[in-house]
């Protein structure tokens, strides 16, 4: 009778262990789908153009975001965190488009949501364009999305880590880095938002070909307006 009780207890413990393991595996698999990701609300031109931005430098000044694209359109990176090595990798990749963007007459800008110490200064070597401060984080909305501990169990995040590490990019942990960033290609005047990429997980970059294709539409629109 005693042996039977021991066997039942052992079987029960094994069942609990197997069940817990199965639940953990199922949780990890589910975490690698888009089910738990923050929902994205697309920005509108009206929402973005009245955003108050600030220049970064010795004599900062305030201006409306629409000044960035009013005449020639713009490609704008909303940086999750300047010290993040994944963001630096993305900025470096985006900067490879600068010669083509210059030919199209389309400027390249970056937006940060905070300016801590020398973080923007240390980010600048990776980004071939001007950087501005969006203190209210408008470019990260209308619905700000965060990635918390979920990022640690997503295979895509670890693949992005590995890619950036292999590329030789380094960073730090200074500043807020949970609110996800994105990328915008905005046409001149009231042409509108031609491309909007929202980072769905750490290191989720915009497709550079899509960015350049959208920028070419700005060039055509500007040329038509000038004729």
Swiss-Prot record:
One of its GO terms (molecular function) is antioxidant activity. Keywords: Antioxidant, Cytoplasm, Redox-active center. It is found in: Cytoplasm. Residues 13-111 are annotated as: Thioredoxin fold. Transmembrane segments: none annotated. Pfam families: AhpC-TSA_2. The active site is at residues 84, 87. GO terms for cellular component: cytoplasm. Its main location: cytoplasm. Belongs to the peroxiredoxin-like PRXL2 family. PRXL2A subfamily. The active site cysteines correspond to the redox-active cysteines of peroxiredoxins. Involved in redox regulation of the cell. Acts as an antioxidant. This is Peroxiredoxin-like 2A. It comes from Xenopus laevis (African clawed frog). The gene is prxl2a.
